[in-house]
Amino acid sequence: MLMVISPAKTLDFESTPVTPRFTQPQYLDHSQELIEQLRELSPAQISELMHVSDKIGGLNAARFGSWTPAFTQANAKQALLAFKGDVYTGLNADTFSDADFTYAQDHLRMLSGLYGLLRPLDLMMPYRLEMGTKLPNARGKDLYAFWGTRISEWLNEALAAQGDDVLLNLASNEYFSAVKRTALNARIINTEFKDLKNGQYKIISFYAKKARGMMSRFVIEERINDPAKLKQFDVQGYRFNAEQSKPDNLVFLRDHAPE
């Protein structure tokens, strides 16, 4: 089983990594192509492109300017430890064992607007480039066109390497839209995490994102390779609901969020 999750806007490049292990991203030639194009934009143009403040636009213009594919532990950090945010709070990779990192490296991938697809221990430099960014490029009108079927092809390779064909989608719609299903040789399993609010079970963004991270951790810690065992997920009050679920869309309900 291979899992995919979204990246995060919030980054942590200050704290010391809990593991010295690292790998290099596999698709940096594509990243370099995007960086060269982004370097042609002024901070104001970057702010407009990304719909962010002048401060964030200026920060990312500087990041693009200093970006180099020569990643070291001095200028980069492992992706799984660099990303922070709701999904990564649920994942809590800072408490992984060495064996957990090994399993995650084989079974977890992070989708990325700049890097395409990252393994947990892949080094990355800080950046912000949402997959939904409408950046015209040589391959089309936006990043979905830029990545084309490449991400699907790379996922196929990762699945083939582990002799499996199950892809567990724990990413947002914005990011999973970069996975072209027609090019993917896999059974896709989707998940929904709903919380009880005003008498109805609803997807509440903050809780759902955190739950995707908790599900990722559950799979890694339990070394799950049988999709049927995903139904055993019962972290922080969530329970599988057969009535609302379908074979490839697993729904988990929770009545009370932890205090």
From Swiss-Prot:
The regions listed as transmembrane in this protein's record are none
Query: Which GO cellular component terms, listed alphabetically, does the Swiss-Prot or TrEMBL entry include?
Result: cytosol
Task: Give the top-rank taxon of the lineage listed in the UniProt record for this protein.
Answer: Bacteria
- GO biological process terms held by the UniProt record: response to hydroperoxide
Annotated HAMAP family: UPF0246 (MF_00652)
The entry sums up its family as follows: Belongs to the UPF0246 family.
PANTHER family (alphabetical): PEROXIDE STRESS RESISTANCE PROTEIN YAAA, PEROXIDE STRESS RESPONSE PROTEIN YAAA
Name of the protein in its database record = UPF0246 protein PFLU_0992
What organism is listed for this UniProt entry? Pseudomonas fluorescens (strain SBW25)
